[in-house]
Amino acid sequence: IITDVEMEERVKLHRQSRPEYWRTYEAGTLLTPSIGEEENYLLDCITTYISNIMFEMTENMDYIGYEMQGKIENRVYSELASLIKEINEKDYNLNLVTNELGNSIVPSNHLARVFRDIQGRINQKIAALSDEVYLVACGIPVKIK
């Protein structure tokens, strides 16, 4: 979700950095309709996807109760698990990009804590479904699964 000029510029630069031969699908909050006949897919990124779902599902960003947090997390996981299942059924390849947010201090504001917690649990669940998992630190991929 593009919310300001800086984000619009960031997205534009990101699009320009992609090789011309890449076919790009910008899915927003609906992932599985993006699957076509290509054999290789890159979802970049789960963190942005979670943000999009949170903004779509939540009216009051000042406080997100535990029930709504669960609904957000369940929807994100359901969509990602469906995508992974469809990719596996077609014997395609899927690379997922996410951010590891749990290596820092606990955020001081409610929204950041909720987001970090949902992100962490989704990362764990997706890693469990994945054949391989890499943590990229300082541009160096480290295989952790």
Ranges and model annotations:
Residues I1-G36:
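Conserved P-loop
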Residues R18, T24, T47-T48, T98:
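Ser/Thr-centric signal marking residues that sit
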Residues Y25-Y41, E79-D91:
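Short amphipathic alpha-helices and their capping/turn segments at secondary-structure boundaries
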Residues T29, E39-M61:
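A basic- and aromatic-enriched beta-loop-alpha substructure that forms the phosphate/nucleotide-
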